[in-house]
Amino acid sequence: MKKINNFDLVCKNLGIPIVFIRKIEKSLKKFNGKIYIVGGNVRDLILNKSIINHPDLVVNLDLEKLLYCLEKAKIRFLKVGEKFGSIVVLYKKFKFDVTVMRKDIETDGRWAKIKFTDSLEEDSKRRDFTFNSIYCDTEGHLADPNKGINDLLKKKS
């Protein structure tokens, strides 16, 4: 598994509030929950580019457990997108889209019927590009089930 060197410093320099993301993850420990940064922010971390979007996060807990943990930790959130397994966590100027790991059960081409999963590999199949399926944990370790890093670096050069 690859790791981003000097992860805390890189996050600070790029504007990712990793300390708060770790606070969210700590709140999930009762259920052995893990949280990952995913999507464009991971791409930007790898390329060492400034962050222009609020971090997208994904957790390996179902929505009910996620909401329970956040409420217990007094972390503010909005229940938007619940039927899609998604909420918004509020922190200072940030609005984190936090989504439970999901897999598609069926789709009509536009909307998918989803089911919770705790598998990065299954969740990654829903992502639009391979480099949007690179997951970064709170210590900077990268999980890359679809070889998105290779695609990202090819595109960069």
Question: Could you tell me what each predicted segment is?
Answer:
Residues 1-157:
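Catalytic cores of the polymerase beta-like nucleotidyltransferase superfamily
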